[in-house]
Amino acid sequence: MPVDSTSELLKHYEVYETIGSGGFAKVKLGRHKLTGEKVAIKIMEKKDLGDDLPRVKIEIEAMKNLSHQHVCRLYHVIETTSKIYMVLEYCPGGELFDYIIAKDRLSEEETRVFFRQIISALAYVHSQGYAHRDLKPENLLIDEDHNLKLIDFGLCAKPKGGLGFELLTCCGSPAYAAPELIQGKAYIGSEADVWSMGVLLYALLCGFLPFDDDNCMVLYRKITRGKYSNPHWLSPSSILLLNQMMQVDPKRRLTVKHLLDHPWVMRGYSTPVEWHSKYPLGHIDEDCITEMAVTFKQSKQRTIQLVSEWKYDQITATYLLLLAKKRQGRPVRLRAECPVIDIVCSPLQDMQLKKSLRFTEDDDGVHPVVLGSMVFPPDCYDDENPWTPLTPKNTHTTNTPRMKLYPETTEKWNEMAYSPVIEHSRPCRQKPERRERTKENKENLAVPGTDGDVFALPAPRTPTSSRKVKSNRTVMTTPNHNNNKSSEVNKGAGSATKEGSRRREVEQQQNGQQGELNILAFSPERRSRSLDLAGCQVDSGQKRKGGKVFGSLERGLDKVITMLTPSKKRGPRDGPRKIKAQYNVTLTNQTNADQVLNQILSILPEKNVDFVQKGYTLKCHTQSDFGKVTMQFELEVCLLQKPEVVGIRRQRLKGDAWVYKHLVEDILSSSSQWSA
């Protein structure tokens, strides 16, 4: 049953900075109050989800039914009249994709460690009747123990007739999609997943994709032919395994069952891959039950009864997070429940709260303290430190630089300085009709009810006037743009040149000549939504409104968090952040952060990259010939603790992951100051 207020979330969680963003959702770093455990909070606006609301239901139902050591855990689901919150396991190591970039490519031995975990996760997911359909490095996160966790089940399918039932929907990420899928043929989900695993294995071993091209029709042709190069460093056994997994004929491909004890997978190991869950659903731990019973002042029998309902509410979240603490060898202890601040004290305040709860990003005015690979306020607690009850009178909002946890390849970036109009990096994608999309989503027929009744629909919005707050950020653009600020930050399709028109005509002619290949182009709505997380993706007029909706809601949420987060004195940021070395940080041989920043500022215009500067952070984006944003990413100059040198933190926000990789490498290699 939906609740009316966001206070249900803030009653149980402390909410910190945005760590992921997309067209449909924001992901914020949070901390569960009773256990002190860090979590990722995925926040979705129902009105922005539109026809994708049933997909959220599919993802939630899948994650409720999956409990595995290499699958991201769902803890809590909160639904309000306008929003859906998913509280998920937090993985501080970031994406496997960033790890590949940091290493350039992985050794066969390290690849084997990761790949065994991927096989384990997929074998389990398939055993539960699900096909993932969106396997890629961006959808695998690294936890604090350097183990992989599979995320983003928004495109998964659980056919009513079983996993052997043929699917029809063309979805996922084109570079990882199987030939039968992009040709529009009926396909078996598990067979398509094996192809994607082969592409993923190739990316781990080589540092680039086996099938890649700027033109998606050329890309599809390469995939349907199944021809790719084998770099000289690949061993014969690796080449053989890749060939067995990336067979154009799905019936000739290896199965996940064969991968469990494949000779390449077994090298250096005495046992096949263990795919069974170490954490079976329904397990009740006596120590966790005892601690909860004492804290909640309930009998153990009653506590077991409440936990066994698995409602994915506060009871479920508390139990699962306590269990996670125990598995990590930490004390099974809960904090004494602090008094809950009644945020909504009157109808007027209730109205003001609902009006103000929108998502946006305010300027950071504080110096964050870095713990590992995450940013926290200075007085955040650890398990060893005592807990201090929070009072509303001396707390301040803490806004810190965001790091992306669940990136999206084709989603909006809700930044005030940028145009909300997005163009995907592949030039030949076409915008499908909404009615066609509805017809094609038939894999998950087991979900009860109609699409429109999956969640309670939001109430119609009463038209109100609003004033736009002008940003005071400095917008830096490349020399080939006009000096007018409006043209710098919001270029529409009207700026297209004659050359662009000719290019469109050529592309249309090319597309018309590809009919004999019978290739089905990926629609933006059915591409990966990796929020996500990352994700993680929109290209419709309806969803362009999401920028404004998310914008003010997050700002309002920050205002509410002001009353509930630890206090922090505000002060101007007069220097770069000090952080520990991370996978997404490039080391330099410099000690002067300002010098490195100036070098980057001089390089970006040469690469036709526009940017907005906020202190030592550059929010960058590239545009197509028609003025639409195709890539968004962050570069932040920071100081490393060990070694004491300047580093550049890089983070993809939107756009094709491999295009981003090449662009950032080009930017950093353009200066002679980066260390090897």
UniProtKB/Swiss-Prot annotation:
Keyword Kinase assigned to the entry: answer is yes
InterPro entries linked to this entry: KA1/Ssp2_C, KA1_dom, Kinase-like_dom_sf, MELK, MELK_UBA, Prot_kinase_dom, Protein_kinase_ATP_BS, Ser/Thr_kinase_AS
The chain positions of domain Protein kinase read: 13-265
Stretches the record annotates as Autoinhibitory region? 328-673
**What are this entry's molecular-function GO terms?**
ATP binding; calcium ion binding; lipid binding; non-membrane spanning protein tyrosine kinase activity; protein serine kinase activity; protein serine/threonine kinase activity
Catalytic reactions of this protein: L-seryl-[protein] + ATP = O-phospho-L-seryl-[protein] + ADP + H(+); L-threonyl-[protein] + ATP = O-phospho-L-threonyl-[protein] + ADP + H(+)
Known tissue expression: Strongly expressed in the eye, gill, kidney, spleen, muscle, ovary and testis and weakly in the heart, liver, and gut. Expressed in the brain and lateral mesoderm at 12 hours post-fertilization (hpf).
Question: What SUPFAM superfamilies is this protein classified in?
Answer: KA1-like, Protein kinase-like (PK-like)
What does the record say about activity regulation? Activated by autophosphorylation of the T-loop at Thr-169 and Ser-173: in contrast to other members of the SNF1 subfamily, phosphorylation at Thr-169 is not mediated by STK11/LKB1 but via autophosphorylation instead.
| Region span, Disordered | 423-518
KA1 domain sequence ranges: 624-673
- Name the residue ranges with Basic and acidic residues bias: 423-443
- Might you give the EC number(s) for this enzyme? 2.7.11.1
Renumbered to this chain, the Low complexity biased-composition regions fall at 508-518
Q: Keyword set for this entry?
A: Apoptosis, ATP-binding, Cell cycle, Cell membrane, Kinase, Lipid-binding, Membrane, Nucleotide-binding, Phosphoprotein, Serine/threonine-protein kinase, Transferase
Family (UniProt):
Belongs to the protein kinase superfamily. CAMK Ser/Thr protein kinase family. SNF1 subfamily.
The protein depicted here goes by the name Maternal embryonic leucine zipper kinase
Source species of the chain: Danio rerio
Q: Which gene encodes it?
A: melk
